Amino acid sequence: MAVSGCTNDNSFGPIVQGCRGDFDFTLRFQNIILGILPAAIFILLALTRVATLAFRSRIVGGKVLQFTKLAVIAATAALQLVLLILSSTSNDESVDGDTFAVANSALGFSQWIVTLALSFAEHSRAPRPSSILTLYLLLQILLDVTRCRSYWLLATSFQITRYAGVFTATIGLKVITLLLELQNKARWMTWRKEDHSPEETSSLFNLGVYFWLIGIFRNGFKKTLSIKDDLYLLDHEMQSKILLDRLTISFAKSSANVGKRFRLAKALGRALIVPLILPVVPRIAMIGFQYAQPFFIHALLEYLIHKDVPKNDGYGLIGAALIIYAGIAISDALFWYFHQRCLYMARGCLASYVYRSTTQGKMTDIGDAAVLTLMSTDVERIIYGFHGLHDFWANIIEIGLGCFLLQRQLGLAFISPIVVILLCVAATTAIAWAIGERQSRWMAKIESRVGLTSSIISNIKSLRISGITAPVRDLVQKMREQELSIGNKFRWLLIMTATVAFVPSAMSPVVAFAFTNEQLDTLKIFVSFSFITLLTNPLGAMFQSVPAVIAAFVCLERIQKFLEIEPRVDYRKSSRPLSPADGSLLEQDDEKPLGLGQGASKSLISIVDGSFGWTSEKMTLTGISVDVPVGKLTLVVGPVASGKSTFCKALLGEVPFSSGEVIVPSTEAPIGYCEQTPFLKNGSIRDNIIWHSVYNQTRYEEVLDACLLRTDLDILPEGDATTIGSNGIMLSGGQKQRVSLARALYLETDFLLIDDILSGLDNSTGNDVFRRVFGPNGLMRRRNATAILCTHAIRYLPLADHIIILATDGTVGEQGSFDKLAETGIYIPTLGLSDADDASSTNSSIPVEETVAATMPVPLTAFSTVSIGHLEAESRSTGDAKVYRHYYQSVNGWATMTCLLSGIMYAVGRNFPSIWMGWWGSNSFDRTSSFYIGIMGLFRGLQIISLFLCATAVVIFMTTQSGKLLHNEILNTLVNAPLRFFTTTDFGAVTNLFSQDMTLIDGELPISLLNTVIQIFDVFAMAVVVAVGAPWLAIAYPVVFSIIYMLQMFYLRTSRQLRLLDLEAKSPLYAHFLDTIRGIATVRAQKLRDQEILFNQDLLNLSQRPAYLLAMAQRFLATFLNLIVMVLAVGVVAISTQLRTNSGFAGSSLVTLMSWGESISSLIQYYTQVEVSIGAVSRLKAFAQNVPSENLDQEDLEPAEEWPTQGDIAIRGVSASYKNDDESPASEDDEESPNLALEDLTILVKPGQKVALCGRTGSGKSSIILLLLRLLDPLSNQSENIVIDGVPYNRVNRSILRRRLIAVPQDPVFLPDGSSIKENLDPFNVASDEECLAVLEDVRLTKFATDHGSIHAGIRADELSAGQKQLFSLGRAVLRRRVKQRLFSIHGGVLLLDEVSSSVDSATDNLVQEIIKEEFADYTIVMVSHRLNIVMEYFDSVVVLDRGRVVETGDPRDLAKTEGSWFSQLWAMEKK
């Protein structure tokens, strides 16, 4: 003891007495706490880690580095052995101390032996540096520095000096070891560096300060980022496939809890249990560092108050400040790293599971809007809501600590803040009861609006032809306003919750000080205030997060409800196993190719007493029993709504309600299925045909020839690489059907199921396709395939091997071979067909080049690239003030002024009390405590009121105003965009504007804007308070704020791009989702569900990359700002301790610093969120300004409502082109273009004349209808060459033109599901109920209305068959004519019909023509028709087109008799 001079070195202490300036720990304390305890824990953890790594294979090279590490570690171990020998043999109590010193040295040597093994295993078998080893080395270095100081202070003898020297040498080697262990091993990994993220090889320190993101920031600052080239890949654990498997297993384990609340939440927690727990340790550490602040403030104020304290204590306080605030920064960084990682793993789990469940669902349970909203909006709200998930348990710990420590300062008065908190909890709980319900209602409104908008985008052509764009546009805008109104009810609750959340932090100090009996001085005021701040700040954050957390659980419940919907059950039965060779339905030697007309053979598919329906109340097919022969062609015919499409779906196992048996060879074999409405994806023609199959050039060319697609591809600028647009919008109806048929034929299968796929083809093209595919030498016969073709084309019946005739009541009327049914049946004899027709038809061969005319809409890929690319460039522009101006122009000025003024008042109310407490502590005004408490309460009340006013102005008024105007702006742009825009622009990208971007404007943008305004004024007010306590620190403000400004500029360059990439990466994900929903029957029939799930996972992984990196980038910013606050805090302490400043103002500064760092971080983050959220406004602005309108300046003429009265149409010398270079009308330079849709067109139609447009597929028939409706523009110098009833066509406003002309599209359109029969029939609401009922009766749909109760009942479009939809669409046209006649007593007008009878049988076609003949007797009619018998019977004139030219006009009856005429050739083909 004599050597050390200390009285307690051999006791636990921990502080020494009587030596080393009384500023050191005792040796026993150092041996136990700084040596033995951490070493023992490390050895235990290290051995466990070595055992884990022992079973892994070697994945890292770098043997030179590994040898260097081991050499340094061995040298350190040797020195540790020397220290053990010295401590064991020394007689000096200063070194030996007691037996704990020897134990410490022994453990020190042992731990380095273990370190040797751990380093060896970690280097070769783990991708990143050892977290256990590097953390322990850092800790040990810090602890050893303390011990080293003690030894050198004791160095009064050779033995002690020798021990201290060796100990110092070990510290140097430990530093070297730490630096070596921190070396990144990416260059030595055995994997490809390009396939992995730097995150996977980063050390814990690298992750903690987000240094692994530097590459992203550097690239983002220099150039425009792209996802595939610049963004890091996701690591293995975040891959969607891995996450999906985890959630699937976890969710399946709780199958007994179906329908119970929180089932999905619990399953998600189990699936991500490790990522969920990892943030706990740094969060606990953060609590410790935060609660060290009040003790630190207490120590600092005591130091400043007592002038006789040793100066060393001041240095200790500076060191303590460094440790505390650095600890807060690092623990916060690590917490958010692990937490954000967990959140995006949850996103991957949920999004992939929703998609997979969608592919398993029944067709009736899958709706575009609802399911897409689950995958997009609901999942995003879950991630947003769970940001504060760990705060709930952490806040309980913090509240308990805060109450305990506050009680020690204020006595029983600590209860008063608890009362305030409990009252706020009660208020928040009461509000929370309504949050879930109001949010659900709001989300339902969003679903409906997005669903209708997506329907508009996909059906814009038919909507414009129908002339109902305006009422549909008004309906969408009305739904948007209702959505905002419902959303405001939810937002009011958010404002109330936010206001209540700030009450504890604002009013608790006032209440606590008012009720305390303690004597309040500077020390007690500021220490108590710091405890209250730590007690109430977490509660404020928690209260604010309550609505978001509740919303997250509501969204989880919505997703769970969807996931628990009973999946589609394949009720079909297999009769024999799948062939192992290629998945075909036929056994390899089962059948030989059979000739035509050999009759039925072995049954491939059987239905026994089957009944099938789409609702439980009504069966579409009843009691049917059929057999489908192998290797044969079976035709299914029947009247409209007899159930032909349902028959196809029944064979696929897709009808939700069924009875009886459906027997197939194998339920796992693919079926080449073609839907009646072709399902095509937004991709190239080649991609649509091949899909997920392996490319086989021979098979591919064979299919192109069979479907007559070669000529179509030859005239396209990019051939089969041409992008066809969403829903194949750039293709004609017949071309869509042939591409769909080509996909089915390309599939490796022996069974084709074709649902009326030839209805959109002219007779000659249809016959040739039929011959090439189903004829005696057709592709189907050569493959010995079995085919079922549902059709209205009775001319093919003699070619069938087997015929199934469905009756109107959904039963099988007759079935058998053609010969059998012709002899004994009822249906066939009435058709006038004979077997002789077979030979003449099948032997005729039309050359391919004559079958398909070389005129079609040309894909405008250049336009697509320019428009979308321009939107991206506009969105990524840095600091575009025009975007902010555009946003603020959409809101009222008074709301903006209210926001700014209330923000200033909030900052004053929140921060002035800190200065006031300094005056109070020194009693500057010589008044009682009540005076100071009263003034403090006044300012805190001002804070709460100002917050409420600011939130109301931004979240309610600004959101509502901007939401209406911005949506209306882009909606008008959408409905007025030229048709060319829709043929080339990605469906998902446009839908994303109305879903994701609108969600940002309604939700994230106003909240971020509110917080930014609040934080701007708050930060500047805090800066004033800090400067009052440390005036010299104010000198550094320009430097500090310059650093922050440069940081945010550097940061924003990248974060803005990441946010936009995040939004853009979701577009293909959502588009694919919608494609899957539309084509789910095709996907499942062709057994491509697994491939589609994998493709979805690839898209999800792609969308995760920018979203995850953006979240990490935001935490990088927060960490950097926390480190800046650390520097400021150390500066305040240094100035205060060295200059001995006023204790009251020093307390103000430190108390303010406790929140200032968080406020600065929040300001930058909120401002960044505003910047990236304003990107949504930028995209909307760019969309509205850069997407041209189809309306031109001179089109301002609005004819009288009764126009046209006569129907006189004159088209003289007009050519038209689908322009691809700009949005101006096509110019005369295009006249020689080979891509002219119409060339030198002259058609004169007299009033009341009935004109049919005929010609082969692609000849330009539909283009004339589009021309008359201004959906296709004539060349610019010919726009005056079209006149209707004397009115110059080029002057009439386009939307008015389409309302005045009555047109019926080929593809009927309906209002969103749930709209009434009357609303669909009369979108303009100008007809009476009686008129609507009369029209329904005339089009034979009265029963449909009666089944629903009334015409005001809501309907779904899929309740109608394809034929019924056409009749309904015709009924809409009839109603418009009758209303016009009632209002204006006008009998004449113009009716345009685009192949309206393509989806109906001959009987229904005759009904359609009779209705047209009777209703539109005085109208001029222009109709596209492939059914020439109708033309012969009902039309006065026919216009025959070929390759966009009029090649013949005249009376169809005369032309049919004229030998060699174009029409006579078509008529001859029709007769065959």
From Swiss-Prot:
Keywords: ATP-binding, Cell membrane, Glycoprotein, Hydrolase, Membrane, Nucleotide-binding, Phosphoprotein, Repeat, Transmembrane, Transmembrane helix, Transport. GO terms for cellular component: plasma membrane. It comes from the Eukaryota. Pathway: Secondary metabolite biosynthesis. Residues 605-834, 1218-1468 form the ABC transporter domain. Disruption phenotype: Leads to reduced virulence. Results in a substantial increase of fusaoctaxin A, and abolishes the production of fusapentaxin A and fusatrixin A. One of its GO terms (molecular function) is ATP hydrolysis activity. Induction: Expression is positively regulated by the cluster-specific transcription factor FGM4 and is induced during infection of coleoptiles of wheat seedlings. The fusaoctaxin A gene cluster is silenced by H3K27 trimethylation by the histone methyltransferase KMT6. ATP binds at residues 638-645, 1255-1262. The chain crosses the membrane at residues 32-52, 67-87, 100-120, 163-183, 197-217, 271-291, 316-336, 386-406, 412-432, 493-513, 534-554, 900-920, 938-958, 1003-1023, 1024-1044, 1116-1136. Its main location: membrane. ABC transporter; part of the Fg3_54/C64 gene cluster that mediates the biosynthesis of the octapeptide fusaoctaxin A, a virulence factor that is required for cell-to-cell invasiveness of plant host. The 2 nonribosomal peptide synthetases NRPS9 and NRPS5 form an assembly line which likely utilizes GABA as a starter unit (loaded on the unique module M1 of NRPS9) and sequentially incorporates seven extender units composed of the residues L-Ala, L-allo-Ile, L-Ser, L-Val, L-Ser, L-Leu and L-Leu, respectively. Belongs to the ABC transporter superfamily. ABCC family. Conjugate transporter (TC 3.A.1.208) subfamily. This is ABC transporter FGM5.
